Amino acid sequence: MESLTTPNSILRRQHIQNFSEASQLEPHWGYAYRVVPCTNDPGSCAYLDVVYDAHDAGMLYTGIFWATVLGILLIWGIGRRVFPAREPVDDLLAQLSTNESTPQRPKPSFLSRSFGAVASSLRHHLLPTAPLRTIFGHTTRLQLVILAVLTSYLSIWSFVGIVYGKWVTPIKGQPADVVNTRTSLGPWADRVGVLAYALTPLSVLFAARESILSAVTGVPYTSFMFLHKWTGYIILVQSLLHTLGWVLIEGWLYKPQPDVWNKWVVQEYAIWGFVALGLLVLLWICSFQWVVKNITGYEFFRKAHYVMAMVYIGALIGHWEELQCFLVPGIVLWVVDRLARLVRMGMLHCGYQRKEGRWGFSSAEAEAKFWKDERFGDVVRLDFEHHQKAWSIGQHFFLCFTEGSLWQSHPFTPLSLPQINNVGDVKHSYIFRAKGGETRKIARVIEEKLKEQKEGRTTTNVVLQGPYGENIVEGLTQDVNVLCVAGGTGITYVLPVLLRLVREKVNPDRKIELVWAVKRKQDLEWVEPELEELRRLGAAHGLQIRIFVTAEDVAPGVRTTTGDEKKVSEDVDTKSVSVGSDESQNQRPDVNVAVNEFVANVAQGSTRVFGSGPPSMITELREAVAQRNSGSKVWKGEGRFDVRLVCDDRLEW
């Protein structure tokens, strides 16, 4: 029990209690103090019992909710370390121990076949793109199932632990027919409000680039963006229901009107509540893809999103500061995320600058190549070496162009293999198509500089931040067959995988193939050195390269080969289309056929499909890979039906 000297800020929501008649105050975590014993009429006292009991239960349930989240992360993190993925070094050790050039994996155990069969069955059902694409976007069924589980879990905690009833109570100084109607709508509205507060730090976690979730689970931060978006929508619905509940109570159920409403709506906590709701609605409207594309632009949306989100959290504290135990962690997580980004950038660019012979900060100077393409967008390639640790294949960096805006950075995946040379430098190579905004501005700068340079080469400075993302070749042992499917500049995602594979020891039973769709035959020049290396080293591996030119007339049937019996074949397939015609499904490679034929020709082992390209291509890949997975066949030992998809599914606007 507390003395009666409790600060007024704690008593501002008195809940029909008369503190002047209180003998003691009972504290309730996250809520107003309660007067004990109750000095109101019996109906009001019964109602207050329900209110405070429901709130205490709600705080307990938020604890259970967060304990569930942390428990899942703990089990996941321990599982990743207790049962790590098999790595190529395991194959090397097997070779050394058996003196065999190609390691023979032991027959899968009962446990291994069980896990493989379950994983394959889950991919078969949960990998395809979810229905209602106009609502959920290009997300998988798995993400939709996770969202449904989260929503159901929150729905349960929204309703349990509340005594539902109705209490009609008299009003002092009013006629007998003027009464207050008290219902469980109030406790329920408070419950959904508390849950909205409790979800706030989780929403921040889902949005973090320096993601704690990624560090624990190994899942790239981009995969959590769908949950960040929909957690925000859940918070919006909870806030609307919370507000609607108390508007009905204060504006209709409580009497006399409009006196009760007028007195309530001018209270500071109510004003801050309306401000927070307004900001939340604005955040929701500004997140629409149409608004971002046609009104705000992505960079303005991103920066405005940060500002409005922080002001929104501040308004929540102003609305009900007793629940800031949920909000302060959200602010801390956001600040730590930003500071970690600065630290990453500093680690890459601060220190002794060997070329300049000084200590300090220095950007990276990249050699730029330019391909003019007025129809589909100009293309730029950047090449430079930077002193740093090697990243993992599949990770990406955020690049800030010093000749553009210092307040913007864009994610790009290096197409180069991350290898440290004898002086500690790692080569970076990037390709991007200038669709608009900052990339178009940089492409124009490079084009103008090339016109002025007589030697036909130019440079531009970049500032790196990263790396981010997952190691996409984790567990890619020599018995895993590899199919790479790319569209346009998506080749940067799959090229490092292939470059690594062709430098490994040969496994004659392994199947490797690249399917690449480009707009023009000229686009092959983007990665000409890398393609030449694949042709030269891939012959021994039986690498097959199939390139589809989809938007220009080229003599069909072009075929070049290198090597002898184990040769690299490169097929350039084209569909004749007139200039200016719209794209059609027939112009692109049939992804479903490519996957089916690849899996059908696998001799042994599982298959991993790497994909990067437009959303439509990724959608087709998901469907095709899901169809080829079969838990029953994997259980019987047919490993080729254990097909895993690894794709670049970063958010595009």
Model-predicted segments: where are they?
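Membrane-embedded alpha-helical bundles of multi-pass integral membrane proteins
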Residues: 54-61, 65, 118-343
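Alpha-helical transmembrane segments of multi-pass membrane proteins
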Residues: 21-38, 74-84, 150-169, 244
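Ferredoxin-reductase
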Residues: 357-459, 518-519, 550
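Non-transmembrane, juxtamembrane loop and terminal tail segments
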Residues: 89-127, 353-380, 554-581
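Histidine-anchored nucleotide/phosphate-binding helix
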Residues: 414, 491-506, 529
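Extended, low-complexity, polar regulatory segments
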Residues: 2-39, 82-134
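Transmembrane-helix exit/juxtamembrane "anchor" motif
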Residues: 70-92, 205-213, 288-293, 325-328, ...
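Reductase modules of NAD(P)H-dependent flavoproteins
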Residues: 10-51, 310, 435-439, 444-449, ...
